[in-house]
Amino acid sequence: MIFELVSSAAVGGVVFLSKMHQKGATNDASKIQRICANCGLKVKEGKETRTIQLLRKTRNDWGVEYAYRIPLGLSFSDFEQKIQHLEDGLNHKSKVYDFKLQDFKSLRLRKDILKQIQNIINKKKLVRKEIELSYDGLLKIRVYEKGIPDFVKFKEDMIKQCRGWEVPIGYTRDGLIKHDFDQLSHMISAGMTDMGKSNVLKLIITSLVRNQSENIKLFLVDLKGGLSFNRYRFLNQVESIAKNPEEALETLRELQDKLNARNEYLLEKGYEDIKEAGDPVRYFVIVDEAADIAPYQECQDIIVDIGRRGRAAGFRLIYATQYPTNSAMPSQLRQNIGARVCFRLQTEAGSRAVLDEGGAESLPNIKGRAIYQTNEKKVVQTVYIDNKQIDNIIKPHINIKARKEYENAKVSNEGSPNGKYTLELEETRLS
């Protein structure tokens, strides 16, 4: 009797799945064709209307890849512009039911089989599909059933996975993405306020201090008053923090002098670059906010010079801004920077100023979601590191003497009326 009930329930589950498939809940291939047609991705040839034609469907662990032939008259960029329409269309009701036969392979013929089926249904309610497009003569549409995580908390093991001048950036569906500053020396980071730009700068600095404490020299330019980099000010690795345009110019002039000296040394010794010379030291120049430095032409000229000549001499430039424009990021600078971490931006024009193409304006409104662009483009969820984690990592590298001087000055200031310093006269042998 129990076996008959259990068997009936199992058959019922399979019948339910079959009906859902007939309703089109799992038939993404036909959905994609309908979405494309409804979005205008079709051409007229005489009396016939042609749209994409499915040639191949390949199932993988991460989801399904569909290969389509594009009708003559349409380009890959036409489909790229409709990526959000495709993703939203595929998720129409997919949050409710999205079953496949293998989902039911885990069923066991036990008394609780109805509960097992219900658990499968409940889990499938949480699914949101994400897609990627590529083109190699055929339009490839990858439909991912497992999305990029919406939040990734920093763990020190992420830094331990990095070698040399690698730093953790974020996660894709496939795992951790790292950036190697010895492979791609310079980076642009851009994004709207509170989307994660400052956090990724702190993640990079903290990772480098932890892994390359003996070999890194940091020159920080923060034209928002120095607050972004305030907790790093007493690090042994920090050479200077510029908090206004005047200090920035002084720092950049000093850096240009160092750059000239190192290049002269390499020329004199016959070395091609700093790696051949066996010099492990790297000079990191981190600028936040680029738009505020743009009006100062000499500052801009030196930054462009560091981007152009700095790689061989061991200089690394990270250039960050909330307001990407062609004036804040001149083409001479962009041409020499091979890596971009771009968070959500308001306009396609802003995205083009950073990535040389649109896309950042279409990122979901998720804090930390970014496009990591090198020779290819990946959407990542950047790693979030909180201030307590930063302090724990950098604490061994703080200059104790400088910290004590700061704390003593703070106590003296707090002990004076109205928070002002008082004049103290001491009797000496000359008085």
Range-by-range predicted roles:
Residues 129-130, 274-275, 359-363, 370-371:
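Short proline/glycine-enriched turn/loop segments at secondary-structure junctions
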Residues 52-56, 175-177, 274:
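Short beta-strand/turn micro-motifs at beta-sheet edges
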Residues 1-24, 62-65, 71, 147-267, ...:
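P-loop NTPase catalytic phosphate-binding loop
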Residues 95-98, 262-271:
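Active-site phosphate-binding and catalytic loops of NTP-dependent enzymes
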Residues 268-284:
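Mid-core helix/loop region of P-loop NTP-binding domains shared across ATPases and GTPases
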